[in-house]
UniProtKB/Swiss-Prot annotation:
GO cellular component term, pick one: extracellular region
Keyword annotations: Disulfide bond, Hydrolase, Metal-binding, Metalloprotease, Protease, Secreted, Signal, Virulence, Zinc
Catalytic residues identified in the record: E192
Gene giving rise to this polypeptide: MEP1
The name this protein goes by in its record: Extracellular metalloprotease 1
Pfam families: Peptidase_M43
Coiled coil regions, renumbered to chain: none
Length: 276
């Protein structure tokens, strides 16, 4: 796996990014040690049944921020219909696991620097809405080759830099109807929000160790490319989860989270975000 490590990724509440390269996604995600430890503890609590009575539906207060360099779609000024289709895709993808995104407001900003992912903290300090349980998605024209990135949940003090930068940045051309084929069906937002909800990539850890700390996702040596049906990169553990939203298949190949991932999202939500 080729890893590009942004400076921001070295802090807790780490960056998780996906970038297209030669027709496939690559990863610049560097989950911090604290999040591995938190995932291991949450997995143990799930195994013990400690979260069994906490699997109620999750309603996520959601804000969309369109940040473009001009009022042209090619410069990132995506339409209301595209945004409506994006929230619909997210809700369809998460509905089987009791998660619903309630789009409260959409903001639109013309700022060429911000639209190219410049001055991230200044942008988010200006635009961010809600508490730590609120999902802020920033649709940007250019992410330096990336499709998107998100921050993992942590214990963030209100008003801190970790709190301000929380949320997801998504390439505007990846929304439904965008120009970013084969990543133009809205699955980038689904994938990135999975990190915001506390999920690793399915290929985390390769064929050994704890992997993604979710027991029902088969081990996977490396990210998928395209839609390689029948791929089995870790013999003995089952075929690779190429249809999982947390792999790197093309959008048309993605169609599921596992039951265990749904449980993990619920557990992480209640551990880090609920009521905050």
């Amino acid at each position: 796996m080729r890893v590009s490590v942004p400076v921001l990724a070295l802090a807790f509440g780490s960056l998780a990014a996906a970038a297209p390269n030669a027709g496939r996604r690559t990863c610049g995600s560097v989950p911090p040690p604290e999040f591995f430890e938190a995932s291991e503890k949450v997995a143990a609590l799930e195994e013990s049944g400690a979260f069994a009575d906490l699997q109620a539906p999750i309603e996520v207060e959601t804000y969309f921020h369109v940040v473009a360099s001009s009022r042209s779609e090619r410069d990132g000024y995506i339409s209301d219909q595209m945004l409506s289709d994006q929230i619909r895709v997210m809700n369809e993808d998460y509905a089987p696991h009791g998660v619903h995104f309630n789009l409260r407001e959409t903001t639109r900003t013309i700022n060429p620097s911000w639209a190219s992912d410049g001055n991230e903290i200044a942008m988010k300090r200006s635009l961010r809405k809600g508490g730590y349980a609120a999902l802020n998605v920033y649709f940007l024209k250019d992410l330096g080759g990336a499709l998107g990135y998100c921050y993992f949940p942590t214990n963030a003090a209100p008003g801190s830099t970790t709190f301000i930068r929380d949320g997801c940045s998504v390439l505007s051309s990846s929304v439904p109807g965008g120009s970013g084929a084969p990543y133009d069906l809205g699955k980038t937002a689904t994938h990135e929000v999975g990190h915001w909800m506390g999920l690793f990539h399915t290929f985390q850890g390769g064929c050994s160790g704890q992997g993604d700390y979710v027991s029902d996702t088969p081990p996977q040596r490396s990210p998928s490319s395209g839609c390689p049906v029948g791929r089995d990169s870790c013999p003995g553990g089952g075929v690779d989860p190429i249809h999982n939203y947390m792999d790197y298949s093309v959008d048309s190949c993605m169609n599921q989270f596992t039951r265990g991932q749904g449980t993990r999202m619920s557990s992480m939500w209640r551990q880090f975000r609920a009521g905050k």
